[in-house]
């Protein structure tokens, strides 16, 4: 879901047609404009928006700050299922906030402060609330576009209604704040977790592949099936608390 949420470099959503420029087949003949996508990169990873390349490491990408080492996520690769015990089950590696000086192979990790809140989250909180309270307010586009511009995209479409703008804000929030421990809470307060947090989750086929161009690795494959039930929107009240006050009513489903 997350990998597919990142758009193309012109801001269009990825769709399997010529208009979007997205393709799930074949490989780039030349190096793209992004340093992480060398010649030979699968086309599905080429010409995506800049934030894709600083958040997601895909099969064949250069490692952070290294223009020589291409990450091998296919089955027999160095970072694949056969090559290491801690391979990524989805076929992707999260690299947000990873320092170029880090070297996991040598257990050399660069410490960074934990970010509690940053400016982009404040802006996204503001435009989300404003869109619910006063749809059409010009501040919505102004501050949403600040985030998009910093992320390398053009301005949001200007004639969106409230529902359409809500979807754009939520998408922007998902991309900009990914891997920042917020998505879990967002899907629950929006009451969409029953649609997004359960069912099959897809990735690359980590049980196949002997090279960067092995077609079998790129087959969309279920790597995990999750369960989300309506009662999961709320945590159960501890029985010890209910015992202390019999008037407390347990949350639904628990």
Per-region residue spans from a language model:
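Acidic/polar-rich alpha-helix caps and helix-coil junctions
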Residues: 1-254
């Amino acid at each position: 879901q997350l990998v597919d949420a990142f758009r193309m470099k012109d801001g269009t959503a990825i769709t399997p047609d010529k208009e979007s420029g997205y393709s799930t087949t074949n490989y780039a003949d030349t190096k793209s404009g992004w340093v992480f996508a060398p010649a030979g990169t699968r086309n599905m990873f080429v010409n995506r928006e800049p934030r894709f390349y600083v958040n997601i490491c895909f099969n064949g990408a250069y490692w952070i700050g290294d223009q020589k080492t291409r990450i091998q996520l296919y089955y027999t690769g160095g970072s694949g299922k056969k090559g290491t015990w801690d391979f990524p089950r989805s076929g992707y590696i999260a690299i947000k906030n990873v320092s170029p000086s880090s070297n996991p192979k040598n257990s050399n990790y660069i410490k960074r402060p934990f970010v509690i809140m940053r400016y982009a989250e404040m802006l996204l909180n503001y435009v989300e609330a404003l869109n619910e309270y006063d749809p059409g307010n010009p501040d919505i586009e102004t501050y949403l576009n600040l985030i998009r511009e910093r992320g390398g995209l053009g301005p949001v479409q200007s004639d969106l209604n409230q529902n359409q703008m809500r979807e754009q804000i939520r998408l922007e929030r998902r991309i900009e704040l990914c891997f920042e421990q917020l998505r879990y809470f967002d899907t629950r307060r929006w009451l969409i977790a029953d649609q997004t947090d359960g069912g099959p989750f897809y990735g690359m086929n980590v049980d196949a592949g002997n090279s960067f161009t092995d077609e079998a690795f790129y087959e969309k494959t279920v790597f995990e099936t999750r369960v989300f039930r309506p009662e999961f929107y709320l945590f159960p009240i501890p029985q010890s608390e209910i015992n202390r006050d019999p008037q407390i009513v347990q949350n639904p489903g628990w």
